[in-house]
Amino acid sequence: MLGGSDPALVAVPTQHESLLGALRVGEQIDDDVALVVTTSGTTGPPKGAMLTAAALTASASAAHDRLGGPGSWLLAVPPYHIAGLAVLVRSVIAGSVPVELNVSAGFDVTELPNAIKRLGSGRRYTSLVAAQLAKALTDPAATAALAELDAVLIGGGPAPRPILDAAAAAGITVVRTYGMSETSGGCVYDGVPLDGSPGSANGSGETGLR
């Protein structure tokens, strides 16, 4: 996919095959499009954001540059959302295999410690939404496991200040992110745009997508 010569990948879960029409499956698209991912639909019907291999690679590289270097990633969000897809692309760029936490039946915080242990040594990251972080903070073992990571990216919507404060008190390195499907995921980290990013914070200090 990132090589630029393969057909574009369409990221749609089997239970949402109705989205295939919105994503223009079967229609002619530019040859440099590597990934078609659904938008959130917050400003209208969901549509397909067409991302090139160059855009995906640049986004992943910029994220690693901001975070302190490539590392191993825990995939704890759905892999068909832009946040999960970004984790997969960052893993490919880093030459690592992500550890997947199955969230198809919900986010089980008791599985976090073992999943994070499987990441091994070196720099380690994950991407969560605020509700997942809040749930993890209710479990001491999960909280301690997240504190071992070099960064926990938080996006998908506003992160309440009490949750951020509790995470900081527990030693968890939270990075608030803002972005959208069209920007290949997070393009603003802690209010500062990534290098080469067209994004800008929304002025409130809150977060959007990963």
Predicted feature locations:
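AMP-binding/adenylate-forming
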Residues: P7, A53-S59, S72-K135, V175
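Short phosphate-binding/catalytic loops that engage adenosine nucleotides
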Residues: G44, S96, I172
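Glycine-rich helix-loop-beta junction characteristic of Rossmann-like nucleotide cofactor-binding loops
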Residues: H64-G68, I116-L119, T143-A145
